[in-house]
Amino acid sequence: MSVDNPGADFDVLGGIEPSQVRVRFPPSPTGNLHVGNVRSALFNWAFARHYGGTFVLRIEDTDAARSTEESLRGVLDSLRWLGIDWDEGPEVGGPYAPYLQSERRDKYAEVVQRLIEGGYAYRDHYTREEIEALGEQAIHRDPANPCPTLSAEEIEIRDRAGEYVIRMHVPDHDISFDDLVRGRVTFTAENVPDYVIVRTGGDPLYTLVNPVDDALMGITHVLRGEDLLSSTPRQLVMYAALAELGVGSGRTPIFGHLPIVMGEGNRRLSKRDKGSGLAEYQELGYLPEGLLNYLALLGWAIAEDRDVFTKAEMAEAFDIRRVSGNPARFDPRKCLAINAAHIRMLDDDTLAAAIVPFLVRAGLVTDPPQPEQWELVRGATPLIKERLNTLSEAVDKLRFLFTADDAIEIEEKATLKPEEASVLDAAITAVEGLPEFTDVQVEQALRGSLVEGLGLKPKLAFGPVRTAITGSKVSPPLFESMALLGRESSLTRLRRARATVA
């Protein structure tokens, strides 16, 4: 394979109107979506939305042994959670239904028969050992006589027994195409042999169903991972044959191969790697917009000096020619930082509502929350907003608000010292007589009593109070937290903590 020239000057649309753009995302329902798959879905979605085209969701479930209804449901739910909506596909329908490949087998069988009759494909009755013995002679064979060393009788015997595969004939010449990301790509003839499209037993393979569905569904552009680059010349052969047979639109899609996503150790990120599955990010409380923003940066940038943007802004600015062909490294820390930026972009009501499911899961609030629980969440949200990287972090930060006063446990590292008893005594005296228990009045009372009255530095003055109120040395802003808890709870906690100090 050789690659020449960047793709920046290519005609992206290939002569069609922008609204005629049709792209597809074809996941296999064999497990949770991988972040690499999500990146591909996002780039296809952004490409379609940028041009006002059509985003097709097509399910590649021909592997019956591994495809499950549960996984299919997971794919659909995950895309909805991400906000990647599809114009055609499962549960939406469309002019090229069905969109599950398992329901399109009759179409594939019909196309295979036409390919054989047209001399584009053939039944291969050779065994693997016989093919190896042929060596280079097996690379490109005559569809009219693909097994010349077998007798007619032996071919008939193997045919009746179903002992054959169906191969696509590949012309014996180099295959070149223009890639929107990589420029001119050429594969030499010896590297693109005749290939199997239907395995023994009749199951169609990806090498058949993928380009057949592209042709039948009028797909104009194929944006996918670099790992599939080597399959492109075979698909180009199939597109050409289908066009000559009058199958589909007769148009060969324009390809763009996205950079590989690398994980730790400079290895390609795989499904087995920690941090590669979408479900992990949902569980941790990443925002869909934050995760998509970071995945967009794996090979593309909205501007040289800007990393944070929305999905809508990406769609408006997206240019496939600006996608880099170099491998993109997945950086968990940057992903976390981008997510934190998106959390800070939310208004307080929206963020509070997003936090609630994590508090429910932790057993801190009911589902739905009681009115007083919601008021606590809503009141505390602006206190922790700047400190959150993920939504799940809110659980530990807010746990003290939803814990009974007599159940607050002081962390070992925050254990109160005997000399801090006087601080707690002064704090109790300072706040128990306040006319109003607001954060401003609590702060004024405690500063006056502890900092000015006892002559303590703020850290030494407020540390024991924070421990008594929250059980920890680290918490949301102290005075606002006490105001949220109210006078009674705050005093109960202060007195209970004071009783534990000798």
Predicted regions and their residues:
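N-terminal Rossmann-like or analogous alpha/beta NTP/dinucleotide-binding catalytic cores
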Residues: 2-138, 203, 232-240, 245-250
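Glycine- and acidic
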Residues: 23-29, 56-61, 217-223, 276, ...
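Residue-level signal for inorganic ion chemistry
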Residues: 44, 75, 115, 119, ...
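Acidic, glycine-rich active-site loops and adjacent beta-strand->loop/helix elements
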Residues: 59-63, 226, 259-262, 335
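A generic structural signal for well-ordered alpha-helical surface patches
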Residues: 73, 233, 312, 444-447, ...
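Active-site cores that bind ATP or allylic diphosphates and position pyrophosphate for catalysis
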Residues: 114, 122-123, 127-257, 262-269, ...
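Catalytic adenosine-cofactor/nucleotide-binding cores of aminoacyl-tRNA synthetases and other
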Residues: 242-247, 254-408, 470-502
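C-terminal accessory/binding modules appended to enzymatic or scaffolding proteins
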Residues: 352, 412-473
